[in-house]
């Protein structure tokens, strides 16, 4: 069983998947930083200090803090601002992946168009012989 597992792990597809997951996780951190450190401050500047991360609704009367971190210490909160930020992260990541897949597909199509057509395979020997006999009979 250990040998079968080793064969499974060493197959190319599993290794490619593992590399993809690792790169995807790192890329997700880049997108999160892009949203938190670049896009959200721009929204904040345009809309007057907008920071979705601190948008919440206290689910008990004991919650009266001004920041989400303090509010979570006071009790249960509905942190819809964090959800909005997560949705923005997802949309940006999905759009970037869409652009990457589109570029790869365009490259594949271009390479297929540029590839010369393969020469036709020679006919089987029996078909060639029958064609030759037909041609000889046609000459008589």
From Swiss-Prot:
UniProt-annotated location(s): Cell inner membrane
Membrane topology value: Multi-pass membrane protein
What is the role of this chain? Answer: Channel that opens in response to stretch forces in the membrane lipid bilayer. May participate in the regulation of osmotic pressure changes within the cell.
Q: What's a Gene Ontology MF term here?
A: mechanosensitive monoatomic ion channel activity
Which Gene Ontology CC terms are recorded?
plasma membrane
Q: Does the keyword Ribonucleoprotein apply?
A: no
Instruction: Name the family.
Output: Belongs to the MscL family.
Q: Which domain of life is it from?
A: Bacteria
Q: How does it assemble?
A: Homopentamer.
* Membrane-spanning parts: 8-28, 30-50, 81-101
* The keyword Transport is annotated on this UniProt entry: yes
Note one Pfam family from the annotation.
Answer: MscL
User: What keywords would UniProt list here?
Assistant: Cell inner membrane, Cell membrane, Ion channel, Ion transport, Membrane, Transmembrane, Transmembrane helix, Transport
Entries under HAMAP family matching the protein: MscL
Protein name per Swiss-Prot or TrEMBL = Large-conductance mechanosensitive channel 3
InterPro entries according to UniProt: Mechanosensitive_channel_CS, MS_channel, MSC/AndL, MscL_channel
What lineage is this protein's organism placed in?
A: Bacteria, Pseudomonadati, Pseudomonadota, Alphaproteobacteria, Hyphomicrobiales
The main location class comes to membrane
């Amino acid at each position: 069983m250990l040998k079968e597992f080793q064969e499974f792990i060493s197959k190319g597809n599993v290794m490619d998947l593992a590399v993809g997951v690792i790169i995807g996780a790192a890329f997700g951190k880049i997108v999160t930083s892009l949203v938190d450190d670049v896009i959200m401050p721009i929204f904040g500047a345009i809309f007057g200090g907008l920071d979705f991360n601190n948008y919440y609704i206290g689910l008990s009367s004991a919650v009266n803090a001004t920041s989400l971190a303090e509010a979570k210490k006071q009790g249960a909160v509905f942190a819809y601002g964090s959800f909005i930020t997560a949705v923005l992260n997802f949309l940006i990541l999905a759009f970037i992946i869409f652009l990457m897949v589109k570029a790869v597909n365009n490259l594949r199509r271009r390479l297929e168009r540029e590839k010369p057509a393969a020469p036709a395979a020679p006919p089987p020997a029996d078909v060639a012989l029958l064609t030759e006999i037909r041609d000889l009979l046609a000459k008589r």
